[in-house]
Each structure stands twice: as structure tokens, then as C-alpha cells.
């Protein structure tokens, strides 16, 4: 069975006879957090006299939000491509005193990414495509390193901020994710933590001899030269490329109990 990813449409498919409906890890996690209703929020913001969007039409607000989203996506794609390109310039790299081969992603001439053999040898895997057929669950980890019997995963994030707590209401109560992970605050750091933990779970399922090691988020912040009319940053460019201001590391725990609960929920609720 070959599992593939098509960038256009962001589609995962396989050539097996089971006709699996694949679910990406990010989409799966999205099931357990409140959905953002952009149209409803734009309408509300337009009428709120204390909002910076007051007096603008719903369409103008939505267009401003979409422009900012596309700007952020562009920065994220640039950084991911830059890191992958830099890594693939080498055949090997030293990690924890060991010289490891760099394993390149399998991409066809048509730009389709093919998932590799899931039994992993010691090495560094940029943009590793992982999947678990039994669940129909798949995803792509920015950087996986298999070294000294451990699975180390790093993911790059370029969004404006990393929030460590959910929204706090006037009673001091923070918003939570949905059951079965309603013990976690609904914030993007916890979303990322679950994402990396599920990647680790999938890899370990195929490689039971390995232990789960470091799970790291690299949060990349870019320099800005000012802000636009809506208060969004205008990125500083140097020689035609975004200028990086800071990279902050978040070392995250493996959320074993939460992942086990999510996997159990998925098995019970998965629609094949």
C-alpha cells in the first residue's frame, strides 16, 4: 500500500482496496477545539464600538483577516522550505555524537509526496510523512530524528504568538478543549503538543523498540518595519527574504494519557 499527499487540495490518498478515508493529524485535533465562525465574528466586530473594526463592513473585515492569514501562511511556507532546503544540502549531520544520514522525502516528478517505509532506521528525516493504516490517520512532521534509540520530533511554527493558556473569562475560568481532552486549555501550544505527541505515537507503533524522546516546537518571530492600517505587522525584508528576529524553543512533554484517550475516541467514532 502506498499513501500519497497532493499539495493541491491538501489531499491524502492511498492505492489500497480498502478505500480508506484518511484524516490528517491537524484535522483530527481540530475536532476537539471550538470552531471559529469568521462571518459571525466579523458581523459582531463591525457593530462593536470598542472594536478596531467598528464601522467597517463584514466583507472588508473578512478581506483584512484573509490577507493577514495569507501573509502568515507565506512566511510559514518560506521558513519550512528554507529549513528543508538547508538540511538537504548535506548527506549526513551530527546528532548526539552520532553521524546520521539525512533521508530525503520521496516526491514524484508531479510533486506528489509518497509516504516512506514506516520502519525507521537511525537518521534525520525532514518533512517525514507518517501514517497508521488501522486508524486512517496521517500527517507530516517537520523534522524527525532517530538517534540512540529515541524518537525526537521538531516542528516549526511561525504564527504571531504561541499561547500557553486558554481564553480567561471574568470569573477567571479558562476555556478548555472538548472531551476526551477537556483537561487541557484550548490554546495553540496544547494543540501543538497533541500534534507532536500523536506523531510520536504513530512512529512508535511502527517502531516499538524506540523510546519517545524530545518533542520541540520552534517558534519563529520575524522582524517588522511597522504595521498596516489594521494593526498587522509589515515584515522586514533583507535581500528579498524575511528577516528573522527570534527563535524560541518550547520543550514539550509526551501527552500519553491524552493521546491514548484520543485514539480510543477515534476508534469508537471513526467513519470508514
Predicted regions, residues:
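Metal-dependent nuclease catalytic cores that hydrolyze phosphodiester bonds in DNA/RNA
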Residues: 1-138
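Internal, charge-rich low-complexity segments
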Residues: 33-40, 160-170
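Short histidine-centered catalytic/ligand-binding loop motif
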Residues: 68, 177-189
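Conserved catalytic cores of phosphodiester-cleaving nucleases, focusing on short active-site segments
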Residues: 80, 139-165, 172-178, 199
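Short, solvent-exposed loop/turn segments at secondary-structure junctions
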Residues: 131, 159-161, 206, 222-223
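A generic structural motif
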Residues: 131, 144-146, 218-220
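Short, mixed charged/polar active-site loops
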Residues: 136-138, 151, 244-247
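Metal-dependent nuclease catalytic regions and adjoining charged, substrate-binding loops involved
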Residues: 185-193, 197-272
Amino acid at each position: 500500500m502506498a499513501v500519497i499527499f497532493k499539495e493541491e487540495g491538501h489531499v491524502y490518498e492511498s492505492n489500497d482496496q480498502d478505500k480508506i478515508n484518511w484524516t490528517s493529524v491537524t484535522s483530527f485535533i481540530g475536532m476537539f477545539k471550538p470552531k471559529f465562525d469568521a462571518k459571525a465574528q466579523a458581523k459582531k466586530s463591525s457593530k462593536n464600538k470598542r472594536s478596531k473594526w467598528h464601522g467597517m463592513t463584514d466583507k472588508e473585515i473578512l478581506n483584512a483577516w484573509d490577507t493577514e492569514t495569507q501573509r502568515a501562511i507565506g512566511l510559514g511556507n518560506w521558513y519550512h522550505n528554507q529549513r528543508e532546503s538547508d538540511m538537504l544540502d548535506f548527506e549526513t549531520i551530527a546528532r548526539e555524537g552520532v553521524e546520521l544520514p539525512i533521508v530525503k522525502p520521496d516526491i514524484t516528478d508531479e510533486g506528489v509526496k509518497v509516504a516512506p517505509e514506516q520502519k525507521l532506521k537511525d537518521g534525520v528525516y525532514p518533512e517525514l510523512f507518517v501514517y497508521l493504516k488501522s486508524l486512517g490517520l496521517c500527517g507530516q512532521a517537520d523534522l524527525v530524528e532517530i538517534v540512540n534509540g529515541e524518537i525526537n520530533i521538531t516542528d516549526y511554527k511561525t504564527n504571531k504568538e504561541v499561547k500557553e493558556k486558554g481564553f480567561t473569562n471574568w470569573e477567571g475560568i479558562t476555556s478548555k478543549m472538548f472531551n476526551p481532552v477537556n483537561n487541557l486549555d484550548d490554546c495553540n501550544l496544547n494543540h501543538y503538543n497533541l500534534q507532536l505527541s500523536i506523531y510520536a505515537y504513530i512512529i512508535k507503533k511502527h517502531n516499538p523498540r524506540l523510546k519517545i524522546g524530545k518533542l520541540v516546537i520552534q517558534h519563529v518571530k520575524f522582524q517588522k518595519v511597522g504595521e498596516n492600517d489594521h494593526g498587522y505587522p509589515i515584515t522586514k525584508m533583507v535581500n528579498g527574504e524575511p528577516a528573522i528576529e527570534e527563535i524560541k524553543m518550547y520543550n514539550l512533554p509526551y501527552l500519553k494519557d491524552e493521546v491514548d484517550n484520543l485514539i480510543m475516541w477515534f476508534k469508537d467514532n471513526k467513519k470508514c
